[in-house]
Amino acid sequence: VALQASGYHVVCLPAQDKEAVNVGLKYVNNDACYPAIISIGQLVEALESGQYDLDNVSVLMTQTGGGCRATNYIPLLRKALNDAGFSQVPVVSVSMGNKGVESNPGFKFTLPMIKRLVVAFLYGDLFERVVYRTRPYETEKGMVDQLHQDWLKRVEANVRNGSLTQFNHFMKKIIRTFDEIPLQEIKKPKVGVVGEILVKYSPTANNDIVRLLEEEGAEAVVPDIVGFMNYSLYNQIWKYENMGMSKQSKRLAEFAIKIIELVEKPMDKALRKSVRFDGIHSIYDMAADASKILSIGNHTGEGWFLTAEMIELLKHEVNNIVCMQPFGCLPNHIVGKGVIETPWTTPAPLG
C-alpha cells in the first residue's frame, strides 16, 4: 500500500505459497539457503502464472549488502529468470544504499515514501503484538482475526498518507480495543520465535509456526521487525568504533536510531500503560546484554541480534524459544543454535 501510494504499481505476493518451494528448487541450486529458494521461487512462479505482461513488468527484491548471501540473491534471481525464459524482465534491487549493492535509476526513496513505509512497519509490529497476545485466549474463535481485519481496512488510508499524527491516534485506539476484548481467564505457556528474518516471519517458510503453537495450546511471542532495522543501524556505530568506518556513517546511524526511537515513543508509552502488552526494547540495552555472551562484531545473518532477542524474551518470562534455522544458513546456525543454551546458563545477561 505504501509503495502504491508512492506511484508504483506493486503486487505483494502471497504469504502462504507452498508451490514456491518446488519452483525455487527448479531454478536455484539446492545448496543455496532456503530463503533464496522460496523468494526466487515465488517471483518465477508469479511470472509463469500468465497474469503479467512480461514486457512491462519488473521484479523487486531487497538486497542487504552484508556478508549474508541475501546480497547475492539478485544475481541468483537473474540467472533463474534467464533459465525460466524471462531474461527481458528487469530486476530492481531495494536497499538503503549499503556497500556492495546495486543502484536502480528508476527507483528512489523519497521522503513521502519513507514516511509511508515507516507507518506501514509500525502498524505491522503493532498488530503482531496485539493479535498474538490475545488470539490464543479469545472466547469466540475468529473474533481476534475479525477485529484485526476490520482495523486493517480502517488504517489503510493512513498508510497511504503517511501521517504519524493519525497513526498515533489510531495506535492508541487499537491498543485500547485489544486491551478490552473479552478473553479467557487462563494462562498458557509463552513460546518465543526467533531466527533468520524470512523464516521467522513467513508462514510458508516456517510452516505457519505461530498458528501451530496456538493450536498446541501456547502463546507465540514474535519480536518486532523494526528492531532488526535498529540492529542494522547499530552495526554501523560498532564498525566506526572498531573497524575504522567513516564518522559520517556512524552519525547517520545514530541519527536514524534516534528518529526511530522518537517515532516509536508514543507507541511504547501506550503499550506500557496498557494492561496486556509490553513496551519496546532499546537497541542499546539489547546490545549491552548480548555483549556479555558474544561479540557485537557478529553481523552476518541475524548476528548478535538473534542472541539479544533470546535474552529479551527470557527477561520477560518467555522461557520457551523456537529458533528458526533455514537450511543452508550457516551464520544463523552459529549465532542461533550455537548459543541457544547460553542465555539460560549465563545469569549475567538476565540481571
Regions found by a protein language model. Name each.
Residues 1-351:
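An N-terminal assembly and electron-transfer interface module characteristic of large anaerobic redox
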